[in-house]
Amino acid sequence: MDMGLKDKVVLITGGGGGIARGIERAFATEGAKFILTDVFPGGMEAAKEELERDFGSEVFTIIANGSVEDEVKRAVDAGAEHFDGRIDVLINNAQASASGLTLVQHSKEDFDLAVQSGLYATFFYMKHAYPYLKESAGSVINFASGAGIGGNPGQSSYAAAKEGIRGMSRVAASEWGPDNINVNIVCPIVMTKALEEWREREPEMYEKNMKAIPLGRFGDAEKDVGRVCVFLASPDASFVTGDTIMVQGGSGMKP
């Protein structure tokens, strides 16, 4: 099915990471073009090579630290310039955090890591991509987490950053609606390399967590999360904004 995204320019932060790689493949199937940003060049360049090899995609890459506003502005403007001043979709995927620490075990540095790499980075990318998104009547897809919605123990800084992203996204959906910019939030549970390593280390805990998912598995970055993102960026979702989409196999259900 043609989702109407051929030749659309998609900016993805954390573009070399595992979840991003799946999302990129989903958009590449639709004929999209890419601006990839990341603080780590290795994974990003590997993603570029994969997209060019497997799909013939046009890919522009640039190193940027999302917590530094000047670097974000430079990356956004350079990417847009490469594609003749165009950005159609912004996907804020990048996030780092300390995990497994109780609230009182967190240092300020631990908290800063989550907030700066997630909340501030999302803010900076949205702020500087806005003129291009306004011109294209584009879409923003921001990543949050069930960690904040469900109050998961050991994830206070991560949850704080992600809930901040959700709140900011809803405000942007209200403010940018008159510009025909859609802003939505995705909360995924995805099988990643880190999760596979955890399964090897603690198989019993892994099985316990998987059994808490009604559909009985972790999501696939391309087929599950990526396809939801494709929908949210497509004309089919033109009347969807300010919403949080739980891509968690039913584990995100709340009364």
Where are the model-predicted features located?
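Substrate-binding pocket helix/loop in short-chain dehydrogenase/reductase
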Residues: L101-L103, S107-V115, N209
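Short, small/polar-rich loop/turn modules that mediate ligand/substrate recognition or access, typified
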Residues: G177, N182, V240-G242
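Canonical Rossmann dinucleotide-binding motif of NAD(H)/NADP(H)-dependent dehydrogenases/reductases
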Residues: M3-I35
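Short C-terminal tail/terminal secondary-structure segment
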Residues: G100, G150, K211, C229, ...
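Catalytic Tyr-x(3-8)-Lys segment
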Residues: V104, E204-K223
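Residue(s) in the substrate-gating loop at a strand-loop-helix junction
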Residues: S145
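Active-site helix of classical SDR
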Residues: M126, A161, S169
